Amino acid sequence: MILQAKNISKRYGNHLAVDNIQLQFKRGTFNAILGPNGAGKSTTISMLIGLKQPTQGEIIYEPGTKIGVVFQTSVLDEMLTVRENLTIRARQYKGLKPNRVSDLIDRLGLSAFQKQKYGTLSGGQKRRVDIARALLHGPDLLFLDEPTTGLDIQTRKSIWDLLYQLQREEGMTVVLTTHYLDEADEADQIYIVDHGEVIAQGSALDIKSQYAKNILKIRFKERQQIESLKSLGMSVEQQSQLEYIFQPKSEREAIDYLAQVRDRIAHFEFRPGTMDDAFIALTGREVR
């Protein structure tokens, strides 16, 4: 493991912000910490990167691990240009290649606005520059704390396409916090946190299959005997005289059932379970 957090907690007076959390991140994987605002995500990240000390517990890195961090709030100078900001930051690291700044400007698509002052950039442009700053020294482990908060859907997608590409090319380990549940769909490992505790963990597929319900809605040509439908082993609920809602455990089960009753079907809809469904099932509320 490139990083392990063993039974870490953080207390502020009588308030327990993080409660006995255990995390493990394998080298080269994409990891997500999900949860509503106030769940303890940012406090956890702050402990992992050393900005805050745990009240109890232990954080263990592989020896020699280099980390990069994209903070919620930028640490760059708004009055300097993109290139000036990156050049000044690059001087803080020893042994960087002379063309490192230019290389990142090209790879992250910053060329068109590299001479603009950072403070004049759009939200998406600033995020790209923030990511470039975090990558200057070639980190083994990249932390991103709510990196796309406040950005529109198209900009969020472009940022995530970039991050997935960089993660594959660089072989980095990535750890992000977010309350946009769709951003974790490709993650190798997800930790869902609420009230400072890990309430579920696993791959996106594992969590969705365990906590999210698939919905198969069928309108039959004629009224059906609900007992005969229940005998097939799926949960079923009658919505109207001809409409029934089933909860197949998998897409395969839905397809097999549709094949069995295809001659009786007037119309059907299938909606696979989502991370939003899983989150609501786990926390009892939508992410906020």
Regions found by a protein language model. Give the residues of each.
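Helix-to-loop junction immediately C-terminal to a conserved catalytic motif
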Residues: 49
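Conserved ABC ATPase "signature" region
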Residues: 87, 98-113
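Conserved ABC ATPase signature
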Residues: 117-121
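Catalytic Walker B motif of ABC-type/P-loop ATPase nucleotide-binding domains
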Residues: 142-145
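ABC transporter nucleotide-binding domain
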Residues: 162-245
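Short, charged/small-residue-rich alpha-helical element at the C-terminal edge
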Residues: 216-288
